[in-house]
Curated annotation (Swiss-Prot):
Cellular location(s): Cytoplasm
Name of the featured protein: Probable transcriptional regulatory protein Ccon26_04940
Source organism of this protein record: Campylobacter concisus (strain 13826)
Main location: cytoplasm
The organism's place on the tree of life at top rank: Bacteria
Amino acid sequence: MGRAFEYRRAAKEARWDKMSKVFPKLAKAITVAAKDGGCDPDMNPKLRAAIAAAKAENMPKDNIDAAIKRANGKDSADIKTIFYDGKAAHGVQIIVECATDNPTRTVANVKAIFSKNGGEILPSGSLSFMFTRKSVFELEKPSANIEEIELELIDYGLSDIEEDENALFVYGDYANFGTLHEGIEKLNLVVKKASLQYLPNQTVSLDEEQMLEVERLLDKLEDDDDVQAVYTNIE
């Protein structure tokens, strides 16, 4: 996705009430990471990344600890990560990442959002060749030379690096998430966000009117409590 599109989404997230929208999604990401790889952040890079993302949003430590404990609790819900493929107008392709303890509820909600907002849900795996899963790290912009950082991180699985005025973006194969995170930590770089994302192999460009039309669907998807992330091929 293009950086302009990312800015647009970030602006929307900034308007969200953190207590009602952002924190529950971050807590669910922490619980899922802890269930998948264990509750010790030192041994679980995905959990470390989820905690770092929560801290970047000023999520209280008590909330973070509670989310980790939920993964270990005997009565904890069985939260599953599920992906749905869909399409919108103007050639827009969409992958929706959900974390849910009730897949029947979630798929019904996602289907309804697509159908009511000019989109269509597709058979599972329909977009698997249209996107590539990548490890994506957003870092505080460092004072060190970017080329030197790039050379250091290549040995840890770096495939690409980008920078803007406020941040440094580091990309790698999804299988290299742990090793790339290790390299970033060894260089004492500050992680703002870290995740596995689906990035489009080809993008589509929308004008302002088309973007507003598609965003109605994207906004509804992102507002759903079970939706953790929405990936598109918008430039």
